Amino acid sequence: FWNPAEPFDWRGDAFDASKIGSLLIYEAHVGMAQEREGVGTYREFTEKILPIIKKDGYNAVQLMAVAEHPYYGSFGYHVSSFFAPSSRCGTPEELKELIRRAHELGLAVIMDLVHAHYVKNLNEGINSLDGTDHLYSPPGDAGYQQYWDSKLFDYGKEEVQHFLLSNVKY
């Protein structure tokens, strides 16, 4: 459970993406955008990559799959916690600082949401949260995506719709 002592100070950030016009989007994975070997951080991305994106003439950055995920090899597309940014790259405040700084630079920020499937793991995430294999997915094989080795959402369920829309609002 993340509970910072002080709320994040957005310093009056009131970014208005509608003033940008046509978007020229730079897509990046925070953990893989660094030149060094290893997992990059939100802080490194803020300090080193955002200025390059701005200098190169982009007006938006799309952050690939930032939600918490147990397997780094999935590039963040095996989501386990839909309401938590990846702890591999830093703290939630460091991600907020990345967004705040991008806005200061005039860059819109687009967050890549993964709502097609989720990690099938039993120890992390929402699979078998209620003891069944179908709280958020169809039961049995119909709820399994073999190519991604993950669980599929059952979009016909009202609970799934509410869950995913809540995630969009988050």
Regions found by a protein language model. Name each.
Residues P4:
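NUDIX/MutT-family hydrolases
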Residues P7, D13-I20, H29-Y170:
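Substrate-binding/active-site clefts of carbohydrate-active enzymes
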